[in-house]
Amino acid sequence: MTDTTLIIRQLGIQDYQQVWQQMREFTDTRNALTPDEIWLVQHPAVFTQGQAGKPEHLLNPTDIPVVQSDRGGQITYHGLGQQIMYVLIDIKRHKANGSELNVRQLVTALEQSVVSTLADYGIKSYPKADAPGVYVNEQKICSLGLRIRKGCSFHGLALNINMDLSPFRQINPCGYIGLEMCQMADFIPTEQAQCDKVAPKLVTHFTQLLGYNDVTTY
């Protein structure tokens, strides 16, 4: 197995905690020959707190469940119409094979994949050095959080495509007071702002940046 082999799994709509458990199990049981994987999924409405999450950033508790996660970062919201891309990558294997991939470079690749995808739709976006994620006109369109275990990554990014953004008003997104969120549907026609249309472009940009050339999709 080489670090250019990748499996993409299209998981549809699944419960956050179920997929989170599967990511942990995958990471704990993988070995040096396990191919890297990308999981594409949407989650029903849920707030997730990162490891550094502070309770005060949940402003108005509602019937939306709150899950304490093991990813980096603060609180965020997941809901239908948001494309999640989880990246299960053996960073240490990439390093051993000379690609010099580290966590910072993985974060940069994730952000750049989103910037390139949005550019495909004529949306100008940018990352921020002091606040991981991707922004359009100072509004956040993509959140990012990773966990590294045994030299391998899991969790990933959440790109707002065509969703109900109102639950974000119940939190300080990613721990930033007053941060406004946006989505692709704010800038392009609804028929273009669809997860099944955007996800392939996102994956293509990411796989090209990391040099995967043996890609299988399930």
UniProtKB/Swiss-Prot annotation:
UniProt domain BPL/LPL catalytic: residue ranges: 32-214
Gene Ontology CC: one annotated term: cytoplasm
EC number: 2.3.1.181
UniProt-listed GO biological process terms: protein modification process
One MF term in the entry's GO annotations: lipoyl(octanoyl) transferase activity
Top-level taxon in the UniProt lineage: Bacteria
Main EC class the enzyme belongs to: transferase
Feature type site, description Lowers pKa of active site Cys: 140
Keyword Ribosomal protein: no
Membrane-traversing stretches: none
Active site: 174 (acyl-thioester intermediate)
Compartments where found: Cytoplasm
Pathway where this protein functions: Protein modification; protein lipoylation via endogenous pathway; protein N(6)-(lipoyl)lysine from octanoyl-[acyl-carrier-protein]: step 1/2
Catalytic activity: octanoyl-[ACP] + L-lysyl-[protein] = N(6)-octanoyl-L-lysyl-[protein] + holo-[ACP] + H(+)
Main location: cytoplasm
Protein keywords: Acyltransferase, Cytoplasm, Transferase
Residues annotated to bind substrate: 71-78, 143-145, 156-158
Sequence similarity: Belongs to the LipB family.
Function recorded in the entry: Catalyzes the transfer of endogenously produced octanoic acid from octanoyl-acyl-carrier-protein onto the lipoyl domains of lipoate-dependent enzymes. Lipoyl-ACP can also act as a substrate although octanoyl-ACP is likely to be the physiological substrate.
Comment field (misc): In the reaction, the free carboxyl group of octanoic acid is attached via an amide linkage to the epsilon-amino group of a specific lysine residue of lipoyl domains of lipoate-dependent enzymes.
Protein name: Octanoyltransferase
